[in-house]
Amino acid sequence: MDKAVSKTNRMAAEISQHGVKEYLAQQQHKGLLRFLTCGSVDDGKSTLIGRLLHDSAQIYEDQLASLKNDSAKMGTTGEAIDLALLVDGLQAEREQGITIDVAYRYFSSDKRKFIIADTPGHEQYTRNMATGASTCDLAVILVDARYGVQTQTKRHAFIASLLGIRHFVVAINKMDLLGFDEQVFNRIRNDFSEFVKGFGELDIHFVPLSALNGDNVVEPSLHTPWYQGGTLLELLETIDTQRELSALPARFPVQYVSRPNLDFRGFAGTLASGVIKVGDQVVALPSGKRSKVERIVTFDGDLPEVTAGQAVTITLEDEIDISRGDLLALPDSAPQVANQIIADLVWMDEKPLQLGQLYDIKVAGKKTQASVTAIDYVVDVNTLARSSAASVEGEGLGLNAIARVTLELTEDIVFDAYSLVRDTGGMILIDRLSNATVAAVMVVSGQHVSKQVSSPFSAFELEFNALVRKHFPHWQAIDISKLGA
């Protein structure tokens, strides 16, 4: 309670001393870190986040009062406060004592602002974990010191790596139950390091802690004199997760065309990577038409340049046809344009993947249709072994499966490899009937394939068939353009 009060008083004192504007400016200029917590069920993810918020003085009096009432009602921790209830918001989660949905929490320290994604540990909710990982820069992987590296721990580490996360903090929890044994810590560190050897270059930190008691979460523990590293909060504050997005090729996905009057036509969006300056020649893709940047417009006035992460409106010197879903880039570092891609895929639907079925696909504001035409191989996340498509023949690719696949699209899309630019290399597949997101797609490569074949059908019949398949997917009409003569 004292920490909550001191937090309130400290904020009031800072505002009184510096004024509201300066206080808000200080908060605005703090760096932002998005990270997720994941691991096997009951490793203590929600408790760890609750402890992190509590010990860093981020909980206020009304929250603590409510938490005490909820803890007494649940009775899971005796007379002590159940910090996991701060995060486990769904009624089903509280009753079962597990995390089902991805729970987001926000807090800040003196050095950084944080967005936490508390992801599920159960295997059937791995798809939720993939959703949380897709926007994070760092993963906190929890390991129960009693059990070591488990199957779900491996699955989460692999998915986090697959989704572009290169920074890991392995939090070895419940060390208090094993007397803070250094040998246990070293064994788990070696096991995890051995497993991720094939994941490429990773930045990994290990920390022994007790989320229940607070050891090495915010304050250093007296029980681990053999550990010379920082606490969990210190690591989160100091690990450099900047991707140097401004050094990457410029990518400006057009979110919408702004036309407030006849004298203004601009293209609004957020620069995903790189830098674009006034006067730069840009190419609009997939059309390939070129022009020069005339203005970079914001609410606060024009800018000479825009850097990655900024939301702006760009106007061009020439009137060229650009619409939502198109992309502006610099000609000497333009992305690829293709209608066939090879990608890693995480299947998120209970209904198995059907080869040849038409799905909606979205990437950087662009929406079109695609079908998976081949499964190149399936990945066993426990061993990272690759098995052929024959291993899922008949059953299809099931929930939580990970595979390398080939997709064919009904029209050209603009893309990068996911390892280069997340925003233009990450896609989602959507079931056209239920509108459910069924897969996360990370592009590896692509090519343009000519689809001109002799057909016994007239142009009208082909166009009418395409119209029916687009607007009446529940009719399950076949694509007659793929039928032979």
Swiss-Prot record:
UniProt binding sites for GTP: 39-46, 118-122, 173-176
Residue ranges for the region (G1) are 39-46
Return one GO MF term.
GTPase activity
Q: What is its EC number?
A: 2.7.7.4
- Pfam families linked to this entry: GTP-eEF1A_C, GTP_EFTU
**Keywords, ordered alphabetically:** ATP-binding, GTP-binding, Nucleotide-binding, Nucleotidyltransferase, Transferase
| Signal found in the keyword field | no
Identify the pathway: Sulfur metabolism; hydrogen sulfide biosynthesis; sulfite from sulfate: step 1/3
GO biological processes: hydrogen sulfide biosynthetic process; sulfate assimilation; sulfur compound metabolic process
Q: Which intervals of the chain are annotated as region G2? A: 97-101
Write down the InterPro entries for this protein, in alphabetical order. Answer: CysN_GTP-bd, CysN_II, CysN_NoDQ_III, G_TR_CS, GTP-eEF1A_C, P-loop_NTPase, SO4_adenylTrfase_lsu, T_Tr_GTP-bd_dom
**Which stretches of sequence are listed as region G4?**
173-176
Q: Which residues form the tr-type G domain?
A: 30-243
Where is the stretch described as G3? 118-121
Instruction: List the Gene3D superfamilies hit by this protein, alphabetically.
Output: P-loop containing nucleotide triphosphate hydrolases, Translation factors
Q: Which reaction does it catalyse?
A: sulfate + ATP + H(+) = adenosine 5'-phosphosulfate + diphosphate
Q: Where is this region: G5?
A: 210-212
Top EC group = transferase
Is Nucleotidyltransferase included in the keywords of this UniProt record? yes
Subunit structure of this entry?
Heterodimer composed of CysD, the smaller subunit, and CysN.
Annotated function: With CysD forms the ATP sulfurylase (ATPS) that catalyzes the adenylation of sulfate producing adenosine 5'-phosphosulfate (APS) and diphosphate, the first enzymatic step in sulfur assimilation pathway. APS synthesis involves the formation of a high-energy phosphoric-sulfuric acid anhydride bond driven by GTP hydrolysis by CysN coupled to ATP hydrolysis by CysD.
User: HAMAP family, per this entry?
Assistant: Sulf_adenylyltr_sub1
Q: What is this protein called?
A: Sulfate adenylyltransferase subunit 1
Tell me the gene name: cysN
